[in-house]
Structures are given as C-alpha cells and as structure tokens.
Amino acid sequence: MEEATKSTWIVAALDQYEGHLLRYAAWIVGDVERAREVVQETFLRLCKEQPARIENHLAQWLFTVCRNLALDVRKKENRMSPLKDPETLPITCDRPGASLEHEETLSQVLRLMETLPKNQREVLRLKFQCDLSYKEISEITQLSVTNVGFLLHTAIKTLRKELLAESEKRRTQ
C-alpha cells in the first residue's frame, strides 16, 4: 500500500475509533490523560502495521491492542478508579425536564454498572459505548461469543431489576 493511501486509512481509523477507544481505555485505567496516552500508543502501533494484515478486523485489532496497553498501565500503577465524569451526548427534547431526567437515569445506570462484576461491565461498555458485535467483543476479551452473550444478558437483567427496584422505592417514599 502506498504511503498516501496508508495515511488516509489511518486517519479514517482515527476518526472512527478514537472516541470509543478513549472511553474504553479511560474506563480501564481510570484517568483520561493516561487513557489518551494509551490510545496514542495504540495508533502509533497501527502506523507500524501492514493494512492488508488487519483491515478485515481493524476494530478488533484496535480494541485488543488498546485493552492490553491499558491493562499494562493499570497493572504498573496497581490501581483503578471508576470514571467519574463520563461523556454524554446532549439530548434535545420538547418535554420540559426530559434532559434532566435522562441525565439522572444515565447517572443511576452508570452507578449501578459499577456494582456489576468487572467482566460484565467490560462487555457492556464494549457493546453499548463502542457499538461492537458479540464476535468483536469475543475476540477482544478472549471469551467465547456464547459467554459474551451470557454476560450481556445477565448484566442487563441485573441492571433492569435494580433500576425497577430503585424506581419502586422512590415511588413509595
């Protein structure tokens, strides 16, 4: 592949995946600045790769490299704290208070997610924040596709149960 085409390919990958990788790495290392370093290193490694070798599974390759680098950083620093300030997209809504309601629900879901086992949190984030398929998640986490599906199902079921319980509790107060 000629250099101009490779550069275009890398820029396209950066545009498409940088935000998702940054949120994923920040969740693992617990710090946005360290996550930026991890994502930067991920893309530096992409620059050294032959596009033909990974173009059919670029997302899996990027997330796997990012995950491994982030885990190395976390292991070195031997600590992990939850991401306190998650990025959210602004919501436009005609109904007054809907945006605040959405933010409260999102905050509640994120708080409840922190109570889930680590493997369930990871597959949830890869699925819903990064919009990856079960197969891609399977390759990144080295779990079977069936196990990914089970973890997602269990996590969603648990979150739904907890959200309903909290909602009912608020209603009766």
Show where each model-derived region lies.
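Arg/Lys-rich amphipathic alpha helix in sigma70-family domain 2
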Residues: T64-K84, H102
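Internal acidic/polar
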Residues: M80-L106, R111, S133
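A short, charge-rich alpha-helical start-of-domain segment used by transcription regulators
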Residues: M1-R23, W27, E33-R36, C47, ...
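Short amphipathic alpha-helical boundary/capping segments
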Residues: I10-A12, Q108-L116
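DNA-recognition helix of helix-turn-helix
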Residues: L71, T141-E166
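C-terminal flanking helix
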Residues: E18, L22, F43, P117, ...
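Structural recognition of an alpha-helix C-terminal capping motif at a helix-to-coil junction
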Residues: R23, E37-L44, K48, N56-N68
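A short pre-motif secondary-structure segment
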Residues: V123-K127
